[in-house]
């Protein structure tokens, strides 16, 4: 065993699995505590609201000593006496505020959608804080703006010009001054409703004519960010343009497809980068990996045990879990030698899983 690590945040399964596969003993503090999180962890603490997270960390820390602390979404800027393996709080703050991130991109001379002023439409409206794109919306007039502000009262936001293209990201590791791109990913978004811009899956690798520009911008941004470990830079990629959208200064939702496609272990790369060691350029991915998050299409209680589908599912809920309509239910995967083959197998697996959700 390489040591005992505590992974804490809203969702931790993907990081806990990577850490376990890297040879660490893992404990987790997690909002969901799904079945498969228990497979990769020695101990777990569940919490409901983010304000409960510090107390949950305190409870598990009284039961175990830890060699490393790795925060995920929701825990990035928590004060801790544990040995942090990731980006220090004083460097992470500007990437938790989308306006500060906007100014950072501009200071790096990296293309970014421009800010819109009051009354300028259409505009992409985003809360200044928050992950996953769940409250982002394209607003086309004052009526739509007023409706958004009524739906999310007292939420500070930014307004940007629209960028048209494919959502994508680059996974990097950085030691604080240098960076190495690990994988380029296509991102899937919900596409409709209040969560139209919410993350719901990825394909790795993402082959695109602008791939080299994305990698160059991502490594430039990651090296200048002052972050440590694995981080993700989100883009929108057009036919002849690239726009930087966001910096995720933590493990990203693309961990699974990056590891499946490349064969690397991101947790090992993360720890190495935090200790000042960057990997050599990775070989070309040996396969294409695709992930899709399935959501409840109605209020429902899932009585079926999905664990027999573990070869192509993750984030597996416990039987008897209640889901509100629109809540994330389970992740499904497909792999193949080509994008088409991976997506075909993904569709086949989704069909199988849906039979258990009736």
Predicted features and spans:
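Hydrophobic anchor at the start of a short beta-strand
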Residues: 25-29, 112, 123, 157, ...
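A conserved helix-loop-beta module that forms one wall/lid of the active-site cleft
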Residues: 85-150, 156
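ATP-dependent carboxylate/phosphate-activation module, predominantly the ATP-grasp catalytic core
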Residues: 161-226, 248-274, 282-284
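A short glycine-rich, hydrophobically flanked beta-strand micro-motif that places a catalytic Asp/Glu
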Residues: 227-239, 282
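Peripheral (often C-terminal) accessory segments that flank ATP-dependent C-N-forming ligase machineries
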Residues: 269-358
């Amino acid at each position: 065993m390489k040591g005992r690590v505590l992974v804490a945040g809203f969702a931790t399964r993907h990081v806990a699995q990577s850490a376990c596969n890297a040879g660490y003993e893992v404990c987790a503090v997690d909002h969901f505590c799904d079945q498969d999180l228990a497979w990769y962890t020695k101990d777990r603490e569940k919490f409901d609201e983010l304000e409960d997270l510090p107390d949950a960390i305190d409870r598990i820390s009284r039961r175990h000593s830890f060699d490393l602390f790795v925060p995920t979404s929701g825990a990035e800027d928590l004060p801790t006496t544990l040995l942090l393996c990731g980006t220090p709080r004083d460097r992470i703050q500007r990437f938790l505020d989308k306006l500060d991130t906007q100014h950072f991109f501009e200071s790096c001379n990296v293309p970014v959608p421009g800010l819109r002023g009051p009354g300028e439409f259409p505009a992409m409206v985003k809360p200044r804080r928050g992950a996953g794109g769940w409250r982002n919306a394209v607003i086309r007039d004052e009526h739509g703006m007023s409706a958004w502000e009524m739906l999310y009262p007292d939420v500070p936001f930014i307004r940007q010009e629209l960028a048209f293209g494919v959502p994508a990201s680059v996974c990097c590791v950085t030691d604080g001054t240098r960076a190495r791109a690990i994988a380029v990913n296509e991102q899937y978004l919900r596409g409709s409703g209040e969560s139209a811009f919410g993350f719901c899956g990825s394909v790795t690798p993402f082959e695109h004519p602008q791939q080299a520009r994305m990698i160059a911008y991502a490594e430039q941004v990651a090296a200048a960010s002052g972050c440590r470990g694995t981080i993700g830079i989100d883009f929108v990629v057009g036919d002849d343009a690239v726009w930087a959208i966001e910096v995720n200064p933590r493990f990203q939702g693309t961990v699974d497809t990056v590891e499946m496609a490349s064969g690397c272990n991101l947790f090992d790369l993360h720890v190495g980068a935090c200790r000042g060691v960057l990997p050599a350029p990775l070989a070309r991915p040996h396969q294409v990996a695709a992930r899709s998050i399935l959501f409840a299409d109605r209020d429902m209680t899932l009585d079926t045990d999905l664990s027999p589908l573990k070869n192509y599912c993750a984030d597996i809920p416990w039987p008897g879990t209640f889901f509100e309509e629109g809540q994330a239910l389970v992740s499904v995967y497909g792999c193949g030698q080509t994008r088409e083959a991976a997506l075909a197998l993904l569709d086949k697996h989704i069909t199988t899983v849906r039979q258990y959700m009736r």
